[in-house]
Amino acid sequence: FFSSDTGNTWTSANNGLTSSTIYSFLINNSDIFVGTSADGLFLSTNNGASWNAQNTGLASSFVHSLAVSGSNLFAGSNYKGMYRSTNNGNSWSQINNGLTSTFINSILATTNELFVGTVNGLFMSADTGNTWVQSDSGITNKFIIAVAKLGSHLIAASYLNEVYLSVNNGSTWNLLNNGLPTGGSSSLVISGSNIFLGTYQNGVFLSADTGNTWNAVNNG
């Protein structure tokens, strides 16, 4: 769906899409990419007016996460691992060397590294995805649903409402759960110095102190 009035009204923008379940979005300059659950990746070059499949080289039809770093695009799939494109999605190459889990939930592209959250741990690459090393020391629940950058720190969220902070680029992690209920996490977003955690049963929680304390923000 597309809105041109800050979300007040929405219109369908599905021309060319053959799958209606969208799991990921990526905007790269004027191009929009969406990852679907059944038919892979689609690209729009006209603000969503039409879409074309961009699946050459992709062995998975379920694209769960997307990221961009410089001239490289990255796609995380379910059970087929990571893919990289160097030509704006025209073709893709699998880049799983070192990944022991190939169900990719999330991708974070920083200036020099890539981080991916999987159903069995967090992995880091310092060479645009050519090789991966596990980077989740201190994380007990390794079903990582999201990883994000907060200033010079990294924040990771696991499925069971566990949020972790790393101050050394992912080498070690500390649990920051004060105020969070038990249950499942669905999403993590950073806005300035604020961290927002979406949950399955308990709404949205906010931390304004680098994850040290959390409060529900569900008014409305």
Model-derived segments and spans:
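A structural motif specific to WD40 beta-propellers
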Residues: 10-13, 51-54, 91-95, 132-135, ...
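Conserved positions at the start
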Residues: 22, 29, 63, 104, ...
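Short loop/turn motifs that recur once per blade in beta-propeller domains
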Residues: 14-20, 55-61, 74, 96-102, ...
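Entry beta-strands of beta-propeller and related beta-repeat scaffolds
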Residues: 31-34, 72-75, 113-116, 153-156, ...
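Thr-biased low-complexity repeat/linker tracts and other Thr-enriched repetitive architectures
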Residues: 1-11, 15, 128, 201-202, ...
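Conserved Ser/Thr-centered positions that define the repeating blades of beta-propeller domains
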Residues: 3-4, 44-45, 85-86, 125-126, ...
